[in-house]
UniProtKB/Swiss-Prot annotation:
Binding site for xyloglucan: 104, 117-119, 127-129, 193-194, 198, 274
UniProt-recorded Gene Ontology molecular function terms: hydrolase activity, hydrolyzing O-glycosyl compounds; polysaccharide binding; xyloglucan:xyloglucosyl transferase activity
Matching CDD domains: GH16_XET
Name used for this protein in its record: Probable xyloglucan endotransglucosylase/hydrolase protein 23
A GO CC term attached to the entry: apoplast
Database matches in SUPFAM superfamilies: Concanavalin A-like lectins/glucanases
EC number: 2.4.1.207
Domain named GH16: residues: 25-214
Family stated for the protein in its record: Belongs to the glycosyl hydrolase 16 family. XTH group 2 subfamily.
UniProt function note: Catalyzes xyloglucan endohydrolysis (XEH) and/or endotransglycosylation (XET). Cleaves and religates xyloglucan polymers, an essential constituent of the primary cell wall, and thereby participates in cell wall construction of growing tissues.
Amino acid sequence: MAMISYSTIVVALLASFMICSVSANFQRDVEITWGDGRGQITNNGDLLTLSLDKASGSGFQSKNEYLFGKIDMQIKLVAGNSAGTVTAYYLKSPGSTWDEIDFEFLGNLSGDPYTLHTNVFTQGKGDREQQFKLWFDPTSDFHTYSILWNPQRIIFSVDGTPIREFKNMESQGTLFPKNQPMRMYSSLWNAEEWATRGGLVKTDWSKAPFTASYRGFNEEACVVINGQSSCPNVSGQGSTGSWLSQELDSTGQEQMRWVQNNYMIYNYCTDAKRFPQGLPRECLAA
């Protein structure tokens, strides 16, 4: 039998500890932060539900902070007349110059599709919205929504299909979130002033409580504890197939084009009226 050197074992062990890869348990890995009992964890930590009524919504956050990672969550959205409601799932750092990577699901009248709203904030500045309709009913079953965030890019995916990529273009003067650790947050709340048809359709409280369900939370990430990352000296040069160096291959690019050609309903990069002084630099570079 071939001998394995001590140094090889040590390197393998160190590599295994560098990156946290966990199929999370809600009881162990998140905390419900608001809602006065409207957030519930059941099934031995495998299922979490958030509810919204006229008095309050609810929300939770990860216990871990991340500086780069791939975060997956399976969500079943509010069914029926969800107009006025927003289910948000995002990464965010604290403070007034925060970074943020957003999925927001804007409810609608029964039979009308949800709007999936995405955005990227760097140092407190957003205005990078792209919106989509989904090609399935997100209320009839769970679907996986993923954020891949590495030093070179952010990729938003739905059931493994990439829908948006935001590249690191710092060399061209565009800010990119890379220095501030972020937690995962999710919430269900009332946004009837703007969420559905620009606020024209209000929340029908006779349909309350509204409920969103979560399972399959997975974090494969560089976890930050007491200011120290579990992935020291991250440069984006991960092992082959690692999310740390992942980029879209030709198949992924084709899938993203299909989604954007058929299901994108708003793109800030084509909204010249919104930016009379000129489109953002990342739009011109793309």
